Amino acid sequence: MKRYSKQTCEFQRQQAKSKFDKIRKTWCDLLRWGLPHKSTWILSQTEGERKNQHIVDPTHVLALRSFVAGFLEGNTSASRPWARIGTKDSERDDSSENKQWLQHFTDRVMNAIGTSNFYHAAGNFYYDYGVVNTGSHYFEVLPNGAVHVHTLIPGSYYVLNDAYGEAAQIIREFSINVKALVDKYGQRTKDGGRDWSNISSSVRKMYEDGNYGTMIDVVHTVKENPNYDFRDPDAFENKQWLELTYELGAGSGHFWAEGQEFAGTIVDKKEEIFLKEFTTKRKPFVVGKSTNEFEYGEKGPTIDALGLIKSLNKKAISKDQAIEQILKPALQGPASLRKSYISHAPNTFVPLDAKSIQGKSKLEPIFSVNPAIGTLIQDVEDMRQQVDKLYYADFLLFLSRNPKTRTATETSAVLEEQQRIIGPNLQSLNNTYNIPVLEWFMDFVLFEDPYLKPPPSSMEGQALKPEFISVFAQAQKAADLPAIDRYAGMIANVAQIDPRVLDKFNVDKLADLYEDRLYLPAGLNNPQSIVDAKREQAAAAQQRKQQLEETLPAVAKSAKDMAAAKMQQ
């Protein structure tokens, strides 16, 4: 079996890093303005230091907050179902037994997502996605069976794509102190002592000397297992994905060496050891991005609005300077006034000598500053509206910003606008984020959830597929419902004139369409077999009633004749 090599890992890290260096400068600029609190790693800043002191106009901060809240609630809401699971055979899904199990499976998947920290991690992801057009999760199953989702810090990870533009390898860099490293990755012998077989000699010495605070640079790489054999999937260590964690550098550490790059030397090249070697059958990371061609997204609201953001910031500073010049201008006057106690405070006495009074000396502004504040404010407001549009805040907050115009027609118009404007972003999120996240949890529930009921025998060998029912997804799929409603209304109106038009109208199809477009829960519409059985029973009952009504007059006449005959006798 092929052994893993640090040299190979380092070669791949340098390859991935060289690709990231193409956009590093852009990310630094985007993070500095869009997410300054997340620029610590990529800009090598000190932890705890305030990083947004250069931001004066917060328009984009508020717009980004609306963007994150809108996508968190509209795409992956914690308060309502945003996905359901079916099979690729839609006819098989219509079976009552299959539909009930698929609903049960969906509930278990949503429960697994809800009991993890996914929704908190998703909020951080949308911040990264809105600023650098890329976000990444790493999934970790804790020893107690719980799922913890890590949102990776922008700039601390590198990505390599496969031939289809999907992330095939991710390489993380992070710093950890000596004590935390030994506690997390250190092993124990059978007698409870320390097993130092996977810890470098330098780190061991630091730990034994009590030098716990020294930061160690660590690399964690995740890629497809080169030793994976698909012909033997049940083998314990034969799993598709490989995780390798190893020490990279020791000494000051990343956060402790301000302005320096991540250390680039292995602690001890002679010690070809890994802190952790781990294989898993599930791809443990997701890289969501706005475009598929490059390893990282290249299109997004912040990069489109960056010029406006900087201009607004500059205008805010210039406006404050202009107002300051009006209130406290630079003054000129006789030199004799320098001896006076000049003050801008109200109700203040400024003593003057007799010569200054006779010469009618006075102070005058050096510059004639008369800024068009009204024009500047209007220009700033126009730019703020453009920033809101680039972050979709004007659509996401339409109802809250227009509380007096919440008519059904306008609400429907907003949904159609969301479909057209947010649609491209949603498609990208589906391919690079929603589907991978949901498929990871689906696989986790299938193999790890003890409360999942066994599927019906009729579903054996069927491939499962996720379907999204979020607010944004409904806005896209339900776009034809207004036209269907108009058609149904037309049929109802025409039926009052000529009821024969109802023969053309398929009510069952209408019910099925609404169930599909609105993603209604399973079981709300009866299966077609039950509907047909009920209609057959109703038709049989109607037929018996009709037969009874037809035979009743003859029976009554016979009874009357018999009664008359008895009376004659």
Spell out what each predicted region is:
Residues K25, R32-W33, L62-G74, D304-Q321, ...:
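Short, hydrophobic/amphipathic alpha-helical patches that form generic packing surfaces
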